[in-house]
């Protein structure tokens, strides 16, 4: 993993002569004014783009709707294939691009749409145009979609501590160990997110009650087949975090709740 990361950074001219192996997974946070070429790679002198520099790491896009629509749409295929193929008149290149996409955004241009106490000053058309910058197919590829609400003063000032980051980290490590054991005989597969359809059928099948819950959600939210697979993968991970062998209905319900930005619910 480190060798591949070093090769990518070397080709991009971002590895110093006396630099040893990069031992930390990358975290890339490009500005929203980035061009399509800078994001995916290419150019007159071909170089890897941000999605390849984030290989085996995180690509963080702050203020997602502020990015160019073309830049966002070009992310769709790499999110599926974990690589990017760049074809030009003089060359065809393929770079690895197995990154974890994390994005943030405001609910509207002013930032107060659906706010419990502040008044949104945006016209409904402005809100819709703002949200429409994120296409349905791109949103479909985002496994966990969470709407953050303002934290009231009473919660901030509570003396009772919540779960510590160290405790959460320990649970995540244990879940990754469970997945490593599960896929020990599967070449190139190390986590639930990488499950093929056959592995999904083998390791992420809910019981009858869970299937009924999922069927209802699919019809109610008008979810796609891609969303169906991703809900199963997320619910399998939730079960792993609870050290549960089976996927229970509550695991599915939590995974379904993470689809709350799907197109049916946007802009009211």
What role is predicted for each listed range?
Residues 1-4:
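Short, small-residue-biased leader/transition segments that mark boundaries at the very start
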Residues 7-16, 81-83:
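Post-Walker A helix-loop "phosphate-sensing" segment adjacent to the P-loop in P-loop NTPases
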Residues 18-21, 71:
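Inter-lobe coupling/hinge segments of SF2-like helicase ATPases
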Residues 21, 26, 37-59:
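Conserved alpha-helical scaffold flanking the Walker A/P-loop in AAA+ ATPase domains
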Residues 45-46, 69-268:
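Basic, amphipathic alpha-helical bundle interface domains used for macromolecular binding and assembly
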Residues 56, 62-63, 74:
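Walker B catalytic acidic pair
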Residues 59-60, 66-67, 153:
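Residues immediately C-terminal
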């Amino acid at each position: 993993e480190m060798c591949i990361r070093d090769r990518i950074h070397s080709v991009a001219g971002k590895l110093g002569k006396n630099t040893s192996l990069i031992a930390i997974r990358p975290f890339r946070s490009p500005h929203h004014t980035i061009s399509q070429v800078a994001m995916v790679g290419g150019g007159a002198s071909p170089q890897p783009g941000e999605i390849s520099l984030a290989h085996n790491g995180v690509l963080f896009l702050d203020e997602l709707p502020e990015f160019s629509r073309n830049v966002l749409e070009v992310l769709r295929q790499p999110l599926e294939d974990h690589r990017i193929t760049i074809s030009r008149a003089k060359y065809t290149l393929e770079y690895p691009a197995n990154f974890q996409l994390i994005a943030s955004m405001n609910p509207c241009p002013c930032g107060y749409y659906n706010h419990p106490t502040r008044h949104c000053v945006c016209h409904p058309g402005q809100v819709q145009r703002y949200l429409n910058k994120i296409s349905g197919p791109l949103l479909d590829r985002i496994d966990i979609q969470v709407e953050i609400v303002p934290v009231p003063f009473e919660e901030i000032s509570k003396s009772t501590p919540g779960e510590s980051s160290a405790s959460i980290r320990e649970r995540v490590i244990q879940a990754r160990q469970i997945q490593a054991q599960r896929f020990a005989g599967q070449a190139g597969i190390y986590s639930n997110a990488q499950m093929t359809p056959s592995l999904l059928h083998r390791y992420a099948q809910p019981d009858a009650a869970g299937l009924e819950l999922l069927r209802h959600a699919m019809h109610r939210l008008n979810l796609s087949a891609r969303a169906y697979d991703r809900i199963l993968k997320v619910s399998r991970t939730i079960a792993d975090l609870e050290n549960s062998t089976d996927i229970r209905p509550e695991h599915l319900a939590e995974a379904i709740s993470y689809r709350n930005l799907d197109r049916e619910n946007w802009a009211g």
